[in-house]
Structures are given as C-alpha cells and as structure tokens.
Curated annotation (Swiss-Prot):
Signal found in the keyword field: no
Name of one Pfam family that matches: Dimerisation
Residues the record lists as binding S-adenosyl-L-homocysteine: 171, 195, 218, 238, 252
Pathway(s) per entry: Aromatic compound metabolism; Alkaloid biosynthesis
GO molecular-function term, one example from the UniProt record: protein dimerization activity
Keyword S-adenosyl-L-methionine recorded: yes
Self-association and partners: Homodimer.
SUPFAM superfamilies the UniProt entry points to: S-adenosyl-L-methionine-dependent methyltransferases (SSF53335), Winged helix' DNA-binding domain (SSF46785)
Function in brief: N-methyltransferase participating in the biosynthesis of natural products derived from phenylethylamine, including mescaline, a natural hallucinogen potentially used in psychotherapeutic treatments. Catalyzes the N-methylation of many substrates, including 3-methoxytyramine, 5-hydroxy-3,4-dimethoxyphenethylamine, 4-hydroxy-3,5-dimethoxyphenethylamine, tyramine and mescaline.
Biological process (GO), any one: methylation
Name of the protein in question: N-methyltransferase
Tissue specificity of this protein: Expressed at high levels in all tissues.
Domain of life: Eukaryota
Length: 353
C-alpha cells in the first residue's frame, strides 16, 4: 500500500462510523421497504422516496439524497443519473444485493434490526468506556450502565425488545440456511434450545422436523416475550444452575458471550442433562483460517470487538478452542459438522463417542 492510499484508508477509518449512523437513519425511515414496494429493479429519486415519509420538511429531499449517496458509495444501494428538462441531473437509487438483506424476507427476517441494535444509544455508550476498561479493568458496558448487559436488558423493556429483535432478525437469516442443509436434527426426540431467546430458532427447526418436542429455555425476562407455538414449551431459568433434559441441546451464539470458565459451567450442565447418546449442537462464530483482512475476517473481528466491550470475558474462538471446551466439559466426541459461511460453524459435542 502506497503512502497516498494509506492516507486515504486512514481517513476512511477515521470517518467510517458516519456511514453506520446514516444506515441507521435510513432503516428508521423505512427507506429500504419503500424502495422494495416500488417493485424489482425500480430506481427512485430521493424526492420520490421522501413522498412516502411523514414529513413537511422542505429540506427532506436534499437531506435524504445526500444520505442515500453515502450508502451508494458503500454499494449498499445502486445509483444512476437521470437528466431533467431544466438541464439538471437527478440521482436515482435502487436496491443492491447488499440492501436486499435490510428488507424483510418472506418470513420477516432482516438485518435492519441488527443495525438498530448495534447503533443503539445503550450499546453505543459502551465504546466511550472501552479505554477506561483497558486501563482500570472491567467491562465497558458495565462501566457505562453499572449493570451487565443482561441485567440492563432485564430492566429496560425498550432495549430488551431492541436486543431481541436485533438478534432474532440476524439469526433467522442465518438459521434458514442452516436448517435447510444441516442434517443433525434427524432422529432427535426432545431438543432444548439453551438461551433460545423468543424461540425463533426452535420454531424454524421444528417446522422442518415436526416430530421433535421443543423446549425453549432462557432467562425469565426473555421468555416472557416468547410467543406460544405448537410443539414448543417455553421455560424460564438459568443455564448456570441447570438445563432442561433432552436428547439434544442446541446452543447458538452463546459461547461468544462468556469466558472459558462460564462456558464450561453451562456446558457441564448440558452434559448432565443429556443421555449417553446425547449431543450438544453448537452454532457459533469462528475465526476463519484465511487472511484476517478478508471481508469475512473483518466481520468476525468486529463481532469480537463488540463482545470485548459488552460482555464479561466474551470472545470469538478458533476450532481448537471449541474442541478444548468440549473436552473440558466432559464430552468424549467433537466434530465440525457444517458451516453456512466463512465466519460460522456448526459443531457437535458428543457425550459418548
């Protein structure tokens, strides 16, 4: 990288958070859904989009155009020009392959709620305390709010919903591919989803495997928002104390929230809840073996940074580190079962080989 390119890259890093905040505002304004309703391949001007917004602000068109231009620069939107009769040029915007993921799929899934979560004031405040956490110890989120992330979610209904929506929206997008391709749920009688949130993961699994009895297990303040679904029992509790019994236990994106000591504690509880032929099906982000400057690696590094700022001892692990957790919790078998992308993996912890 030459000096000029390095300087430009440094500027991009110094200003990079602005684009994320523009993206958040565009999501809040429902712009992507407005564009989607216009039909496939349609390109709209900022004025045409703004006409669907509840605003009388005379500057809204110009402001929105500048925001959409930012997203086009990041290839979140496509952009073309249209010549007007008065000789001026008007920019037209369309959905790109990237922005499709910020619109709702047939099952209502979208990455838009994850964007709102990651730029939420409650989350964002953590970053202002990261320096002090490095110097003086502690967790940035805890220093900002005097509570852990999960304690805070338990007392703030607004943030609890933002958190659950952000997790479930992203989860549904990824889980759909996993359920279609991973075959390890075949033959399972009772499946316990530990820290299953509001139950979307379990519902997707049972929709394909209707003979499975599902148990959605999470903290009581999370379970209270879980809808009732056929074939699923919602149980409130604490995975660090005990876990409901089943012949398979599903855990997704939980180990990344905890240090090894805490992971071993709930994994040992899972071990105790399983019969000899049982298994834990662990779906986690994992450090890719490829270059750490790839898009996939940057996603994982960003997620690792979030866990650093918000949870006690949380981090992204390597395959070898997951195998060490399995063996440390007493499981005799470990295997990499399936991967939906470069950044995640489905692993099986087998109680007995």
């Amino acid at each position: 990288m030459g000096n000029e390119e390095a300087f430009t890259f440094a500027l991009a890093m110094a200003t990079g958070s602005f684009a994320n905040m523009v993206l958040r505002a565009v999501v809040e304004l429902d712009v992507f859904e407005i564009m989607k309703r216009a039909g496939p391949g349609t390109h709209l001007s900022a004025a045409e989009i703004a006409a669907h917004l509840p605003t009388k602000n005379p500057d809204a068109n110009a402001m929105l155009d500048r925001m959409l231009r930012v997203l086009a620069g990041y290839e979140v939107l496509s952009c073309s020009n249209r010549s007007l009769p008065n000789g001026q040029v008007e920019r037209l915007y369309g959905l790109s392959p990237v922005s499709q993921f910020f619109t709702k799929s047939e099952d209502g899934a979208s990455l838009a709620p994850l964007c709102l979560l990651n730029q939420d004031k409650v989350y964002w405040e953590s970053w202002y305390h990261l320096k002090d956490a490095v110097l003086d110890g502690g967790i940035a989120f805890n220093r900002a709010h005097n509570l852990t992330l999960y304690e805070y979610a338990g007392i703030d209904d607004r943030f609890n919903k933002v958190f659950n929506d952000g997790m479930s929206g992203c989860s549904t997008t990824i889980m759909k591919k996993m359920v279609e391709n991973y075959k390890g749920f075949e033959g399972v009688s009772t499946l316990v989803d530990v820290a299953g949130g509001i139950g979307k993961n379990l519902n997707m699994i049972i929709s394909k495997y209707p003979t499975i009895k599902g148990i959605n297990f999470d903290l009581p303040h999370v379970i209270k928002d879980a809808p009732r679904c056929r074939g699923v029992e919602n149980i409130g509790g604490d995975m660090f104390i005990s876990v409901p019994q089943g012949d398979a236990i599903f855990i997704k994106w939980i180990c990344c929230d905890w240090n090894d000591e805490h992971c071993l504690k709930f994994l040992k509880n899972c071990y105790a809840a399983l019969p000899d032929h049982g298994k834990v099906i662990l779906y986690e982000f994992i450090f890719p073996k490829a270059s750490e400057t790839s898009y996939a690696a940057r996603v994982i590094l960003n997620i690792d940074a979030v866990t650093l700022a918000t949870v006690v001892g949380g981090r992204i692990r390597t395959e070898a580190e997951f195998e060490a957790l399995a063996k440390g919790a007493g499981f005799e078998g470990f295997k990499m079962a399936y991967s939906t992308s470069e950044v995640d993996a489905v692993m099986e912890f087998l109680k007995k080989k």
